[in-house]
């Protein structure tokens, strides 16, 4: 029996090296014969929900946990032997290094179980692991004993012994800080010198003559290829460190046969890689510090804006050190960077230029962020959204919406007949993972993201009331029921429903139109119209809307305020399509929507483009139905 059980009264086991597909149910089936289990948890990534390869099994009784550890360690689950040990809740026990030994030069055939069986004779083992990669064992491992005395006995007996005909090294585990300190101490007392860039005509004798004046050398070697030709580098090993140091000081950087040679301390590959990594990280940190607060990210650029135009637009705010529009295949990617000489200039540029219309589009300007910072910010947003989704009881899923992302369960309840589905605010983005319109204006099938889904038996609504899935912005109008059920019109939504249909977190706007719709060409007959900023947007029957009012409103109300002012204007142009068009236009950035409210011509242009997209889609759907009817393929 394992004598360490009394030290762990919580009876919690760590189970590692798990196959990614192992679930709590599989572990319960495996461990329940050992005794009653309180809980099992497979640890997973917070975002992807993929298994991290380890789990915790909590038994009711320590004796049951001890029995599982003794009888099930290294058992195979889904083709992989699992590694079981007592759960160490105190991190200081794991990180102190007491009782931990390091073994290297292991044969490839030695696995965790073989290492455990070999070293268990010296004392109770808390943890045992052979380090592996995708190709198998890397030839070294670790054994953590319960006591330091057991570790010392293992080192004394096993160091230098043969395991599977290979002489192994067994020693005390040393932290990276300790190893780096030892390497630094050895580096100061080096005797081996590395020389490179001396050409192809150098041989051992000439190299010895060149460096022999600094002191007696133990060995001199010029590295050659298979034909005996010099590779341009070699080594000289001196007897004393002082001689080696003198050779480096006097010969490094000198010219030899018209070439400047390099002379320095010979390093192992690992040392060189570590030093290069350290230098790279230092350069990266210096660059980040240098550009902190002065580098701006500019997006939503018009296709006609190049580096010079970008520099010209931002030059009034200070000295620009660089301005770059990112390109791909000779075409603008729609974003770029502007770097100023001081943080004050950059801050002023953000204040003045963010939201300003340049050419035909409003700019988004903000301080540039590193990839790690952006990912952390997006992860935080995602976790907040997920937390709010899970807090909403009994959400209702529209049967014509795509399925939620994989790994996310959401209960559905039946809807009352002729009632519109209710979407909690933060669920909208979760329920609509696919884009509303493709580049050709095609609507995705509502079941394309739901493998093996059963189509509902209810009659399919008319196209005028169906909404393809959207990943960002919900429809802002509620369905009005009228006497004629074959025709439904869109009307202004109630304030409560509007607030519920607005996402809690505003993400990057997604433009869902074709390229010609999104980026109007400059060579059209009409010149781009620049409308003077008005103090407020007036819509009959509603209070004036200003940019400051919109900015001060919570994110979940901003789209509602814009939608309530856009809908009556669009309804006057296209009464039957007002709801659809409003929902499409609300995916545009708020600053551009304000501009459209101020400029009737701009609004009409965008509405006409949206109508063209809808008509193209309807024509394509009608043609597809005709083809299916001709070929006898049933339509759904």
From Swiss-Prot:
PROSITE patterns the UniProt entry points to: PABC, RRM
Q: Where is this region: CSDE1-binding?
A: 166-289
> Where on the chain is Omega-N-methylated arginine found, per UniProt?
455, 460
Resulting phenotype, residue 460 to A: Greatly reduces methylation by CARM1 (in vitro)
Q: In the UniProt record, does the keyword RNA-binding occur?
A: yes
Any idea which residues bear Dimethylated arginine here?
Answer: 493
Residues annotated with N6-acetyllysine modification? 512
N6-methyllysine PTM sites in chain numbering: 299
- Which CDD domains does the entry link to? RRM1_I_PABPs, RRM2_I_PABPs, RRM3_I_PABPs, RRM4_I_PABPs
Concerning InterPro entries, the annotation shows: Nucleotide-bd_a/b_plait_sf (IPR012677), PABP-dom (IPR036053), PABP_1234 (IPR006515), PABP_HYD_C (IPR002004), PABP_RRM1 (IPR034364), RBD_domain_sf (IPR035979), RRM2_I_PABPs (IPR045305), RRM_dom (IPR000504)
* Record keywords: Acetylation, Cell projection, Cytoplasm, Host-virus interaction, Methylation, mRNA processing, mRNA splicing, Nonsense-mediated mRNA decay, Nucleus, Phosphoprotein, Repeat, RNA-binding, Spliceosome
> Modified residue Phosphothreonine is at which positions?
319
Q: Which GO terms describe its biological process?
A: CRD-mediated mRNA stabilization; mRNA splicing, via spliceosome; mRNA stabilization; negative regulation of nuclear-transcribed mRNA catabolic process, deadenylation-dependent decay; negative regulation of nuclear-transcribed mRNA catabolic process, nonsense-mediated decay; nuclear-transcribed mRNA catabolic process, nonsense-mediated decay; positive regulation of cytoplasmic translation; positive regulation of nuclear-transcribed mRNA catabolic process, deadenylation-dependent decay
Q: Which residues carry this modification: Phosphoserine?
A: 315
Family assignment? Answer: Belongs to the polyadenylate-binding protein type-1 family.
Q: What does this protein do?
A: Binds the poly(A) tail of mRNA, including that of its own transcript, and regulates processes of mRNA metabolism such as pre-mRNA splicing and mRNA stability. Its function in translational initiation regulation can either be enhanced by PAIP1 or repressed by PAIP2. Can probably bind to cytoplasmic RNA sequences other than poly(A) in vivo. Binds to N6-methyladenosine (m6A)-containing mRNAs and contributes to MYC stability by binding to m6A-containing MYC mRNAs. Involved in translationally coupled mRNA turnover.
Domain comment from the record reads as follows: The RNA-binding domains RRM1 and RRM2 and the C-terminus (last 138 amino acids) regions interact with the PABPC1-interacting motif-1 (PAM1) and -2 (PAM2) of PAIP1, respectively.
Q: What name does UniProt use for this protein?
A: Polyadenylate-binding protein 1
Classification of source organism: Eukaryota, Metazoa, Chordata, Craniata, Vertebrata
